Swiss-Prot record:
Protein name from the UniProt record: Kinesin-like protein KIN-14E
Region span, Disordered: 1-35, 960-1080
Name of encoding gene: KIN14E
Segments forming a coiled coil: 247-355, 736-893
Gene Ontology, cellular component aspect: microtubule; microtubule cytoskeleton
Pfam families hit by this protein: Kinesin, Malectin
InterPro entries reported for this sequence: Kinesin-like_fam, Kinesin_motor_CS, Kinesin_motor_dom, Kinesin_motor_dom_sf, Malectin_dom, P-loop_NTPase
Species the sequence originates in: Oryza sativa subsp. japonica (Rice)
Organism placement in taxonomy: Eukaryota, Viridiplantae, Streptophyta, Embryophyta, Tracheophyta
Length: 1080
């Protein structure tokens, strides 16, 4: 959030009228630097719009540098030694491989970042003050827009338990753009003992993101200057000396700018408080505006809802009125129709009454009629018994006929050539010349034809109805209680599934069989009740799968044998079907769940044996006999050889299991044909399931499907050979010689019995129907007349209720129209109020925006003045640093000259032995003492800015001079002993006075010479004065062995102390006289 600094909320409030009359000028767009600095909420930190450089982080300052979201890196520079991302809580690490513009010396720092809502807790730091640097870069939303990511940064010192808001709504992209670095440096933090630094990143819009965190030591600048107001305290004599004009001016400027800085800081704090108050008021105004906007939106929504309700009610009213008009017309038409019908019914009633009277007259005597009916009932009972006997004979004869045809019959069906086979040039290899007699021949190249004999041969032109017509007699056996099995055999692609299942428009054997079952069951429903249930399963890889199960079960299905000898599969779904539609749904569900695959022979090849089991439970209502039969409709998998399909993997395993089960079926067929005592039903799941329907009293029908193409001759011959083996079951030579004449007689007797039964039934049924029709007609007419009267009454009552409802609806319509008008008036008033409130809020918002703009302008002016003052202070600091630099250079030259002087003095002390030279040395020391006083006063002013360095130089200088003076004193003592032996004690004061006079003259000459000497010569004289000073002090404090020498020394020290004020006075004279002096 951008905080705009103002000059005072009170003044802005006072200038509201002026702001309304004259709109404030639009402020200039802030620079990226200013935009970033406006997001900083504490003084001290600064913003850098570039990457990290080598000089930004020195070895003695750097404590910890965290590569957020990245790994540790090693380098020569301290800034290049980045530690891996640690100390964090929450967030995710992200990286980018794009180039970082202006990334500095270490652009890799900005290739990774920590992203999300997270915080850092950095512990293990030594107590003290630190600088915190944060590195940012927008590496996710590199194309913006502005404002897509804004977040706050808060720093908490753990023991303080307070969060300091450092950055507010920082938008990196708005400041520098995408893939560009941004640094916030010099955030001040303090660490106490056993505490940590907590940095919290809080998202305002989007998720926060940081690339690096650097912690540096903060070096405190110690203030050791001993400068007072207008004076400098001398380190040597503790005397207050006057400042030079430049120093005085500098100190005044410094104090002046410090006061200005303090005032500006106070003003800035005051303006920040005022800005915060203004911002809070603006926020409250914005919140109030938002609240009013929400209320306005709610009012608009309410008005819209009211309008919608009114429109809806109006539509309902119109629809009700239209319905009423339509109903009114319909009821009028219905009433007219009913009146016409009533008239016609009255006419019919009169006619029926006349017919009833005629019938009553035509009916003979009632007793005769009763006798005739009783005789008819007796005849009916006799006919029923004969009918049951004939039915039993019919069943027996039907089964005899079926058994004469053979228990297992084989039908051969050949499909037509496909388009692909015709286009590939394949020809028909099947000869259908003897198809009517059941013969079929196969032409195999140049070899002779091979002929096969079957019960029925279907040509490619025969349809599904023709095929089923020969299989339908077996359906009757199922209803009579026999187990029946119908299965289709042949290679893949020969039409087995088409024959058994068919399509929705061209049904197969399965559907037609069930349809025939329901048809016959409907015909026999008066004498026999049937319950039909269907199960669909498949044998896939020698495993039984229930195709009607809603979800596949992991439990294997096994075949069990019941106590009565039948076989069943526990757990399989048996769907009870009541009509043919349910049958088709069950067949479709099973067909869709069947395993299908592709191979070289057929793209959609059935890879399992599909078995449809129809369970029929019958109960004879006449004699109570119950039967339970089973019909198996089996669509076998393809019988082609493995070499032809060329399959691998899972398809190979499927083909092997299919061939194994078909081989087991062939073994069962062979055992049945040869009448073996053991039939291997259990060698396969297929034969085990069909054990009840193969052999014994069961009946079986096999469809062998063949291909007419000469490309499939080998598979066709294999299928026909297998079918021939099946046909030989129960068809020995003796059974083929059936007496057809006797069979014809039996058929004729059966037909005559059926015709007699039909004639008797028809005559009986006609008599009964005539009686019942006469009675029912009379009753029906009466009941119909009563119903018509009741309907007329109901229609009249409904008409009355409709009229009443129409009246009430008209009243409601009038009330709704009134309410609608009231609501429209309320909506108009609400819209006017809302418009007025919105205009008032817009005015308030414009006023607040103009005030904020004025405050921003004033804040920028204050910041400009402050920057100017800071620039002036920096210039003064640079000048002071230059002066200090010149002073340090002069002192270094003075030290060099002092060292040279020490060496020369040592050589003079060893060579000069005469008293006269000693006197000259004493005179030089007095002059050096005077010059030392002068140089001390001047140097104290110059060295005031760097007292620590001056003090160090003086201490070293005094130690060196004290050592030199001790050496000179020792040599002078030895020489003084020799002089005292040759001279008297009385002459000592004269010598001292003469030395005093010479010292005064030399001091005056040195004072005049110092002004004209360069800096190097002045420093040399200053060094000599420093060397002479400790010797004088030592003479005044240490006792001497020669009493006469003590008197001279004390007088000399006294004279030296007396000349001190004179030297101070003469120090200021060279500025006036400017004379040039010479030193001997």
């Amino acid at each position: 959030m951008d905080f705009s600094w103002t000059t005072g909320w009170e003044k802005a409030a006072a200038d509201d009228d002026e702001a309304e009359s004259a709109p404030a000028p639009a402020p200039p767009a802030p620079s990226p630097q200013e935009a970033a600095e406006s997001m900083i909420l504490v003084p001290g930190p600064r913003v850098v719009l570039s990457g990290l450089m080598r000089g930004d982080c020195r070895a003695d300052d750097s404590v910890l540098f965290i590569n957020a979201g990245g790994s540790a890196t090693e380098g020569c520079e301290p800034s290049s030694k980045l530690s891996e991302d640690s100390f964090f809580e929450g967030g995710d690490a992200i990286e980018t491989s794009e180039d970082i513009v202006e990334g500095g010396d270490y652009p890799s720092l900005y290739h990774s970042a920590r992203y999300g809502n997270f915080s850092y807790k950095i512990d293990g730091l030594a107590p003290g003050d630190y600088f915190l640097d944060l590195h940012f870069a927008e590496i996710v939303n590199t194309y913006g827009p502005k404002g897509i990511r804004a977040f706050d940064v808060l720093v908490q010192e753990e023991k303080a338990n307070t969060l300091t808001h450092i950055l507010s709504e920082l938008d990196v992209y708005a400041v520098v753009g995408g893939n560009r670095p941004l640094q916030v440096r010099d955030i001040r933090v303090t660490v106490e003992s056993d505490s940590a630094i907590v940095i919290n990143f809080k998202g305002v819009r989007g998720s926060p993101m940081v690339c690096g965190i650097c912690i540096r030591k903060r070096v405190a600048m110690a203030v050791t200057d001993m400068v007072t107001e207008g004076n400098v305290l001398c380190k040597r004599c503790s005397a207050h000396t006057g400042n030079s004009p430049l120093q005085t001016r500098t100190s005044k400027l410094i104090s002046k700018y410090e006061k200005q800085i303090e005032e500006l800081t106070n003003q800035c704090n005051m303006k920040s408080d005022e800005c915060y108050m203004a911002w809070s008021s603006v926020e409250s105004t914005n919140q109030e505006l938002e609240r009013l906007k929400i209320e306005l939106h709610q009012k608009v929504m309410q008005s819209d809802n009211i309008e919608q309700v009114v429109d809806r009610q109006a539509d309902q009213l119109r629809s009700v009125s239209q319905k009423y008009e339509n109903a009114k017309k319909l009821w009028a038409a219905a009433i007219s129709n009913l009146e016409n019908k009533i008239k016609a019914m009255k006419q019919e009633q009169t006619l029926l009454s006349l017919e009833a009277h005629d019938c009553a007259n035509a009916v003979p005597d009632l007793s005769k009629m009763i006798g005739a009916v009783q005789t008819l009932v007796a005849q009916c009972e006799d006919l029923k018994l004969k009918y049951y006997e004939e039915m039993a004979k019919r069943k027996k004869l039907h089964n005899i006929v079926e058994e004469t045809k053979g228990n297992i019959r084989v039908f051969c069906r050949c499909r037509p050539l496909s388009k692909d086979e015709t286009s590939s040039g394949y020809k028909c290899a099947v000869d259908f010349d003897g198809a009517k007699d059941g013969d079929i021949a196969i032409v195999n190249g140049g070899a002779a034809k091979k002929t096969f004999k079957f019960d029925r041969v279907y040509m490619p032109t025969d349809n599904q109805a023709d095929v089923y017509a020969d299989a339908s007699p077996l359906v009757t056996s199922v209803l009579d209680g026999y187990n029946v099995c119908i299965f289709a055999y042949g290679q893949t692609g020969t039409g087995k599934t088409f024959t058994m299942e068919g399509t929705e428009r061209n049904r197969g054997v399965n559907y037609r069989t069930l349809e025939e079952l329901f048809k016959i069951a409907e015909e026999r429903k008066e004498t026999v009740t049937y319950s039909i249930s269907v199960s669909v399963l498949e044998v896939y890889n020698e495993q039984i799968r229930d195709l009607l199960a809603s979800s596949p079960s992991s439990k294997k299905l096994e075949i069990k044998q019941a106590s009565e000898g039948s076989h069943h599969v526990p757990g399989i779904v048996e769907a009870k079907v009541e009509n043919i539609k349910e049958v088709w749904d069950v067949l479709q569900a099973g067909s869709n769940a069947r395993a299908v695959g592709s191979n070289n022979v057929n793209e959609h090849s059935s890879r399992s044996h599909c078995m449809l089991c129809i369970m029929v439970r019958a109960e004879n209502l006449m004699n109570g006999e119950c039967t339970r039969s089973k019909l198996w409709l089996v669509d076998l998998a393809g019988s082609e050889r493995l070499a032809k399909t060329d399959v691998q993997g899972e398809r190979l395993k499927e083909a092997q299991n299919i061939n194994r089960s078909l081989s087991a079926l062939g073994d069962v067929i062979s055992a049945l044909a040869t009448k073996n005592s053991h039939i291997p039903y259990r060698n396969s799941k297929l034969t085990h399931l069909l054990q009840d329907s193969l052999g014994g009293d069961s009946k079986a029908l096999m469809f062998v499907q063949i291909s007419p193409s000469n490309n499939d001759v080998s598979e066709t011959l294999s299928s026909l050979n297998f079918a021939s083996r099946v046909r030989r079951i129960e068809l020995g030579p003796a059974k083929k010689q059936v007496d057809t004449a006797e069979l014809q007689k039996v058929k004729q007797m059966l037909e005559r019995a059926k015709q007699d039964i039909r004639l008797k039934d028809d005559s009986l049924r006609k008599l009964e129907d005539n009686c019942q029709n006469l009675e029912n007609k009379a009753k029906g007419k009466e009941q119909f007349y009563k119903n018509l009267q009741e309907k007329v009454k109901e229609l009249e009552s409904q008409l009355d209720s409709k009229m009443h409802s129409q009246i009430t609806s008209e009243k409601q319509q009038n009330e709704l129209f009134g309410k609608l008008k009231e609501k429209e008036e309320m909506c108009t008033t609400l819209q006017q109020k809302i418009a007025e409130e919105s205009e008032h809020k817009l005015r308030l918002q414009q006023q607040s925006e103009s005030e904020i703009k004025e405050l921003e302008l004033k804040l920028k002016e204050q910041e400009h003045h402050r920057s100017v003052a800071e620039s002036k202070i920096k210039e003064l600091e640079l000048k002071l640093k230059e002066q200090e630099h010149h002073r340090s250079v002069a002192e270094s030259k003075a030290m060099e000259i002092g060292q040279e002087l020490l060496e020369t003095q040592r050589t003079e002390a060893m060579l000069q032995i005469k008293p006269r030279d000693l006197e000259n040395n004493l005179q030089e020391r007095t002059t050096l003492q005077d010059t030392n006083m002068i140089l001390d006063s001047t140097n104290c002013m110059r060295v005031a800015s760097t007292p620590g360095e001056a003090k160090a130089h003086l201490l070293t200088r005094e130690e060196a001079m004290s050592e030199k003076e001790q050496h000179i004193l020792r040599s002078s003592d030895s020489m003084n002993k020799k002089v005292t032996n040759n001279s008297s004690i009385v002459g000592a004061p004269e010598v001292v006075n003469e030395k005093k006079r010479k010292g005064d003259a030399r001091n005056s000459s040195i004072g005049g010479e110092l002004e004209n000497q360069p800096v190097g010569s002045q420093n040399a004289s200053r060094k000599r004065s420093l060397q002479g000073e400790p010797r004088l002090k030592r003479k005044s404090t240490e006792p001497l062995k020669n009493p006469g020498r003590v008197t001279a020394t004390s007088k000399t020290a006294a004279a030296t102390h007396k000349t001190g004020p004179v030297t101070r006075a003469t120090r200021q004279q060279p500025a006036v006289n400017k004379t040039r002096g010479w030193v001997r």
